[in-house]
């Protein structure tokens, strides 16, 4: 591990923050990431850029050294040679590099090497973390090849998430919000990251897993569309089943895509809303009927939960018929037929 170009400026009153990026043979895109990081508005924030170079055999390290020589923030680098790293393990290593650089106190943000944070990204993420424990920012594709089906898919899931918050409102949600969590734009405090055990060593989906774990632990997850990172719509990515893989699949056989049935999702969202109210009032009779559990069982679960978020995530099951999948076209029609869905969309 090495720190290149440490700053001597006083950082005592600024919020310590680490931008954590896993890098694997990204020489083609690192210059645009570095340029974007240099443009970040950082008033009141003491950022540092933490780069985990995972089995790189291109010019990535040379580019990092060239950038760090004149960077306006500390650049901290760790190289891992010939590793068995997958997406989750590499991102976790990048986050732990950031953790060590912060001495265990501050904010960890993560993005990807092919991403370009908006100028106000740091400020927006920090503002979000004043209201929540985890902030999942919005990822906007840099469109070099149109994909109307993916546009429809994203619009559907945004409308579905709006339905969720109309049926199960929480006061920490972003306004505007969006539907997903991506490692290209995610932030939380060091203590929160440690409490969750970090990103799991998964080949893909490590970001969604961390956010699900956070909600089940009772942490407030804020999906905030004002925290924006632009990312590549390249078709050749570093992660199996990542965005690049999704784009290739849609290019090839997109009309066959299926999505969550909004009727089943709405059933679960309503249950979450009922569970929150039951937890707040310590009155579990109506919830017991809805989820087919005994009042004694619900009281016991509530006793072990730190707050309503954790309780709702634990006690509301999947719908009686399971979480079905339907075609995107059918799902769009079904969502529009749900009264709260019409308002949400």
Language model feature labels by segment:
Residues 255-345:
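Terminal low-complexity segments of carbohydrate-biosynthetic enzymes
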Residues 53-63, 115:
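A conserved acidic beta->alpha catalytic loop
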Residues 35-46:
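Short, acidic, metal-binding catalytic loop of nucleotide-sugar glycosyltransferases
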Residues 102-116:
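Short beta-strand-to-loop acidic/aromatic patch adjacent to the donor-nucleotide binding site
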Residues 81-102:
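Glycine-rich, basic loop-to-helix element that forms the pyrophosphate-binding segment
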């Amino acid at each position: 591990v090495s720190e290149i170009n440490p700053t001597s400026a006083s950082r005592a009153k600024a919020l310590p923050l680490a931008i954590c990026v896993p890098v694997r043979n990204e020489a083609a895109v690192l210059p645009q990431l570095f340029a974007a990081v240099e443009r970040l508005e950082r008033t009141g924030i003491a950022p540092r850029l933490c780069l985990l170079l995972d089995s790189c055999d291109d010019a990535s390290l040379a580019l990092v050294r060239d950038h760090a020589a004149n960077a306006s923030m500390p650049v901290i680098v760790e190289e891992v040679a010939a590793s068995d790293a997958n997406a989750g393990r590499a991102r976790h290593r990048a986050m732990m590099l950031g953790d060590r650089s912060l001495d265990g106190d501050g904010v960890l943000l993560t993005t990807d090497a092919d991403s370009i944070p908006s100028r106000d990204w740091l400020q927006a993420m920090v503002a979000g973390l004043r209201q929540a424990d985890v902030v999942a920012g919005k990822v906007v594709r840099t469109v070099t090849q149109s994909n109307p089906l993916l546009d429809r898919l994203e619009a559907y899931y945004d409308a579905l998430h709006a339905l969720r918050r109309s049926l199960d409102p929480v006061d920490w949600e972003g306004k505007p919000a969006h539907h997903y969590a991506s490692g290209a734009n995610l932030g939380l405090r060091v203590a929160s990251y440690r409490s969750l055990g970090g990103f799991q060593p998964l080949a893909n989906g490590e970001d969604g897993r961390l956010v699900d774990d956070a909600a089940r632990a009772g942490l407030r997850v804020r999906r905030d569309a004002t925290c924006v990172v632009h990312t590549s719509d390249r078709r050749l990515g570093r992660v199996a089943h990542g965005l690049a893989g999704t784009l290739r699949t849609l290019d090839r056989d997109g009309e066959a895509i299926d999505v969550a049935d909004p009727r089943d999702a709405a059933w679960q969202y309503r249950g979450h809303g009922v569970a929150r109210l039951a937890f707040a009032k310590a009155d579990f009779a109506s919830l017991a009927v809805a989820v087919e559990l005994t009042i004694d069982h619900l009281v016991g679960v509530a006793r072990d939960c730190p707050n309503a978020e954790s309780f709702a995530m634990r006690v509301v099951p999947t719908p009686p018929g399971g979480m079905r999948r339907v075609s995107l076209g059918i799902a769009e029609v079904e969502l529009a037929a749900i009264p709260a869905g019409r308002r949400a969309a």
